[in-house]
Design a protein with these regions (language model features):
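Feature representing long, continuous alpha-helical segments
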Residues: 153, 178-179, 183, 202-203
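Short, polar/flexible loop-turn hinges at active-site or ligand-entry regions and domain interfaces
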Residues: 188-194
Length: 210
């Protein structure tokens, strides 16, 4: 508890200038995508409206509807993934959504919670929220900063150490809950699997399915 309290009070530095520049870059690219989507659609519409987007894709452009909901055509990520290559507008919409998410959730979201006095982000770390006992983070969720895309990784670079004498280290335990369980239960099969760097899920499946 003491460590988490110290983390929350101390906070983490973020390069506000770099974050603002990144946000402006996203804004510029998002505007380019909006104009290109309008051009490909032949008209302006609310790209963020699934209903309006569905009409454009499946009625005006004649693409085959993959899935329907009670309110109309589904335009979720799975649907767009299946439509890739069918029309150039699909890739533009997918990129638009990715960048809009980065801009609103992370750039704007992080900027909004930078403490005006410390210049840091003071996320709340909670120890008793998750069922498994894993630490959770809110306001903002510092455990959910994007990493899978190149732009997401760029965003991570904006969190900076105290000064040039320090570095930030990113470490992640491998299957920590199952390792603790194996130790507490003294499960010989699990312990052997972990010691031999085996895939514990494959070992479990082989035990269950024979």
């Amino acid at each position: 508890v003491g460590v988490l309290a110290d983390m929350q009070i101390y906070g983490i530095r973020i390069d506000r200038k770099q974050l603002n520049e990144f946000s402006e870059m996203l804004d510029g690219r998002i505007n380019e995508l909006v104009n290109e989507i309008y051009r490909l659609a032949g008209e302006e519409f609310n790209i963020n409206s699934p209903k309006q987007l569905g009409v454009i894709l499946f009625e005006k452009l004649g693409l085959t509807a993959v899935k329907k909901t009670k309110t109309g055509y589904s335009t979720n990520a799975d649907v767009l993934e299946k439509l890739k290559g069918k029309h150039p507008i699909i890739e533009e919409i997918m990129e638009y959504r990715q960048l809009a998410k980065l801009k609103s959730t992370y750039c704007d979201g992080l900027s909004a919670v930078i403490n005006s006095k410390t210049g840091r982000i003071h996320s709340q770390f909670k120890q008793t929220v998750t069922v498994t006992g894993r630490i959770s983070s809110t306001e903002p969720n510092m455990q959910n900063i994007p990493v899978r895309t190149s732009l997401g990784r760029e965003l991570r670079k904006m969190f900076i150490a105290e000064n040039e004498d320090y570095v930030l280290v990113d470490a992640d335990y491998s299957q920590i809950e199952l390792r603790v369980l194996a130790h507490i239960a003294d499960d010989k099969t699990m312990i052997k699997a972990f010691c031999n760097n085996e895939d514990i899920h494959a070992v479990t499946a082989s035990q269950v399915l024979g």
